Amino acid sequence: MHENIVAAPELAGEGLQKIEWVRRNMPILRKIQYEFEKEQPFAGKRITVCIHLEAKTAFLALVLRSGGAQVSVTGSNPESTIDDVVAALAEEGLRVYARHGAEPSEMRKYMETVSYTHLT
């Protein structure tokens, strides 16, 4: 297992606040989370998410985890990656490999890394 790649772990609190705001304001996703918690449709599964990493998509990753999945996350665009949200996901126990402004070679490495987490 690879260590998380997080540019600013000290910003996790700010990221958690953003994700909590999203949670409060997305009732449909909250309902899905509730159902996933009960039904555990992804128990024992590994899910990789490669997406614009910001508060709404971070909440989606957490919803997937609430369904029992082991979730690994990377950003799909270094310019849309929000570092405090990345730090929050790591703090919440997800495997995260992303940072704002990453170079193309880094992005490739992050995408390979999230793929490797599912091969072991």
Labelled PLM ranges:
Residues H2-F36, P41:
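Positively charged, low-complexity intrinsically disordered leader regions
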Residues A43-K45:
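Phosphate-coordination loops involved in phosphoryl transfer and adenosine-cofactor binding
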Residues E54-G67:
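Histidine-anchored nucleotide/phosphate-binding helix
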Residues A55-A58, I82-D83, M107:
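Short, well-ordered alpha-helical microsegments
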Residues Q70-E79:
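Short internal beta-strands
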Residues I82-G93:
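Active-site-proximal loop->helix
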Residues T117-T120:
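Conserved small/polar residues in nucleotide/adenosyl-binding loops
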